[in-house]
A protein has these predicted regions:
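Cytosolic, long alpha-helical scaffolding segments
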Residues: 1-173
Length: 173
């Protein structure tokens, strides 16, 4: 939060200067990126707190639940790394791939929560663990949402056009 406020303050001061159109776009892009990184940090902090709670209360997850958390975590991290790469390199080569992966994460969140309800019904997991599991899965999915926003922050219209074009081409084949 401290860094977010400091960086945002600098960007506001920059925005107050006489900037050309390109520089105004860059400052706007940076606002969006900083905001999304800060939100990812908030969700990561939540996940860390859930992990500490799980540990301190000696809550166990089933192997299936643990595997699902690992799976969605790895996919979320991939979306984040690729989004940062797209941002750093201003290269949209893999944008459709990570957009599809982010959509998969959305679907997995719903599936994993449904699976967890079934585990609770069959007493394979305990209610205290169920709340932590669903909160962690939800926070990971939100991290992927904010991560993909970073990739789209460069030039949302250009990026969206590339994704739509590749989606249409993929459907036509």
């Amino acid at each position: 939060n401290f860094l977010n406020h400091e960086i945002t303050g600098c960007l506001i001061r920059l925005h107050g200067q006489s900037l050309n159109e390109h520089d105004e776009e860059v400052v706007g892009m940076m606002f969006r990126v900083v905001s999304n990184i800060e939100r990812i940090g908030d969700h990561a902090e939540n996940i860390a707190e859930y992990s500490q709670m799980k540990s301190s209360q000696r809550i166990k997850f089933s192997d299936e639940a643990f595997g699902q958390l690992k799976d969605i975590s790895e996919k979320t991290l991939k979306v984040f790394k690729e989004s940062i790469s797209i941002y750093d390199n201003e290269s949209f080569d893999r944008l459709d791939e990570i957009t599809n992966l982010e959509e998969e994460i959305d679907d997995l969140k719903d599936k994993y929560i449904e699976d967890h309800i079934v585990r609770l019904k069959h007493d394979n997991c305990k209610p205290r663990g169920g709340v932590i599991f669903t909160d962690m899965v939800t926070d990971l999915e939100r991290c992927s949402d904010h991560a993909i926003n970073i990739a789209f922050a460069i030039n949302g219209e250009k990026a969206l056009g590339i994704v739509k074009k590749s989606y249409v081409i993929g459907k036509a084949e």
